[in-house]
Amino acid sequence: MKDYFKEGLEKIKVSYDENKMEKSLKYLEILLDYNSHTNLTAIREEKAIIEKHFLDSLLLQNLLKDEDKTLIDIGTGAGFPGMILAIFNEDKKFTLLDSVRKKTDFLELVKNELALNNVEVINGRAEEIIKDRREKYDVGLCRGVSNLSVILEYEIPFLKVNGRFLPQKMIGTDEIKNSSNALKILNSKILKEYEFKLPFSNEDRLVIEILKTKKTDEKYPRKIGIPLKKPL
């Protein structure tokens, strides 16, 4: 698996060292073991996990800036993209948030096993923890989950003014077009769209770079359940 992972990293032009490689493969080992008794991901084959979780998450690596010091991954699941990015960026602090206890228990295990001092795991919801963390983060992360107009309402309030949100999406959806109202209300705008291909399957991936231009009204995010039922 090591050679396969190295080849993938080289194809997507992400640099690595032996420490990052060792921790990533340990993460893979823990995930495979945990997933055998607790369903964290439907992808179960080693090479598929490396490409569709690890390398897919690391498509963000070259979009991160030196000045990006605090990042939040909302709905992180089994830790993608936040945990693998934390392994590759020990100088940056990552908050991994998920409301499902079995997932955050797993993430705590990974954090402790890999001695990742730059990772904070929180079991909870964005609407519950925003009070103490409003406009505290440089970068917001989220892979796939929810419609863009919904996840914008969760993510943008956490970002500092001039902070960026880097959602990962599938190419060919109407989500961008349908998110114009949410972007306006939350004082944010799309800077750029990046199209990538996964290194082995050649599957298309999209990363959207969104800038927070001004403070967000403190009534956002709305109470639990409302963003999903009544998107902006």
Curated annotation (Swiss-Prot):
Q: What is its EC number?
A: 2.1.1.-
User: Which top EC class is named for this enzyme in its record?
Assistant: transferase
Record's keyword terms, sorted: Cytoplasm, Methyltransferase, rRNA processing, S-adenosyl-L-methionine, Transferase
- Mostly located where? cytoplasm
Q: Extract the InterPro entries matched here.
A: rRNA_ssu_MeTfrase_G, SAM-dependent_MTases_sf
Disulfide bonding pattern of the chain:
none
Q: Which GO terms describe its molecular function?
A: rRNA (guanine-N7-)-methyltransferase activity
Subcellular localization is given as: Cytoplasm
GO CC, alphabetical: cytosol
Annotated positions binding S-adenosyl-L-methionine: G75, F80, A126, E127, R143
Please give the superkingdom of this protein's source: Bacteria
* Cited CDD domains: AdoMet_MTases
- Family as reported in the entry's similarity comment: Belongs to the methyltransferase superfamily. RNA methyltransferase RsmG family.
NCBIfam families, per the entry: rsmG_gidB
Protein task: Specifically methylates the N7 position of a guanine in 16S rRNA.
Task: Write down the HAMAP family for this protein, in alphabetical order.
Answer: 16SrRNA_methyltr_G
The protein depicted here goes by the name Ribosomal RNA small subunit methyltransferase G
Gene symbol here is rsmG
